[in-house]
């Protein structure tokens, strides 16, 4: 059997039902998991609570910055900080979960990339409508 498949099967066999359900959830909104004080990011208790209670499979809207998220250049994650911050949240989840399973980062780009420093384009469905030549 493939070593990767063996590893996955071993991991799944160690998981509780609650942990398996947690891997399927996107219950925590990434933009609500951290605070920023100048150049220092700290995780809010919400992240650890969610991780301990249910587990986390997906962190969505981590980089989102718009009026709805209340994230701005003073409070959000800037372009140059993205990679380091995503690595930081991955490390936090791995270090603070029983089996050390990393999370899937969902950037919610179906609405256009709503992140600081991103180029904004219309949503894919709107862009598709522009190619009707008749």
Regions found by a protein language model. Give the residues of each.
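N-terminal beta-rich core of secreted/periplasmic extracellular enzymes
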Residues: 1-134
